[in-house]
Structures are given as C-alpha cells and as structure tokens.
C-alpha cells in the first residue's frame, strides 16, 4: 500500500514522502497514529506541486543572496569609534555594530549571526569581514575603522 508520511518515521522516510509499505503496517500502525495517510493521485500531485514551489522559492532566495553578495563585495562601510593615541579602541566593534552600520550606510538588513568575526575588532584599520548570506554564498565586505 502506498502512503504519504505526515511526519518523519524512523527507518521509513521523511515527512511528505510517498512510500510503499505492507497493508497491515499502514492500517494498524501508521494511519491510526496519524503518521501517514493513504496515497491518492490528487495527494501525490499536490505534494509534487508543493515540492516544485519550494524548489522555486529556494532558487529565488539563492539568486537574491548572490545579488546581495555582489553588491556587498563592491561596497565598504566606515565605522567611527573612540580610540586612544596608539590606535586601540575604547571597547570593541562586534558583528552587531557591523550589521547596524550596514543597514544605516548601505540599506541592507543583514542578520548579525551571518557576519563572521573571529574576535571583535579592537584596533583602527581596514578589515575584510566575511558574511555568509546563504548556503554556499559568501561575501567579503571592507570595513574601515577610524577614530572619532
């Protein structure tokens, strides 16, 4: 019997997948526990359309991320911070401040978790900051830190 899984079932498949199982297993275990429903042509067609829509959505997100990455690669931001005579900042610049400056100066809203800094910036100078926008899409942004 063909069934469509409503949840992930260990050893059988993931949610929304169509699998072939024994009739008794489907009727006595999967269907009563609402883990699966019998597969019909309409349901299979609906699942196929849903997967195609998800694929198109992922492709759009990937294109948007690539477009944003190319814009960020060409851009740079300048952050002014209080610093001592030897170029050491009072405090530090974290990925949160970089995300805020990107929004303020460039107009792009980027989640601070996507900005990769090994350590907060503590000295005046120029830095290449890595931003992971999407799976496999990485941008490097020039960040110039100056004394205010």
Swiss-Prot record:
UniProt-recorded name of the protein: Large ribosomal subunit protein bL9
GO molecular function: rRNA binding; structural constituent of ribosome
Keyword Membrane listed: no
Signal peptide boundaries: none
Biological role: Binds to the 23S rRNA.
Keywords: Ribonucleoprotein, Ribosomal protein, RNA-binding, rRNA-binding
Organism: Caldicellulosiruptor bescii (strain ATCC BAA-1888 / DSM 6725 / KCTC 15123 / Z-1320) (Anaerocellum thermophilum)
Cellular component, GO, one term: ribosome
GO BP annotation list: translation
Alphabetical list of HAMAP family matching this protein: Ribosomal_bL9 (MF_00503)
Family to which the UniProt record says this protein belongs: Belongs to the bacterial ribosomal protein bL9 family.
Any single Pfam family the record assigns to this protein: Ribosomal_L9_N
Name of the gene encoding the protein in the UniProt record: rplI
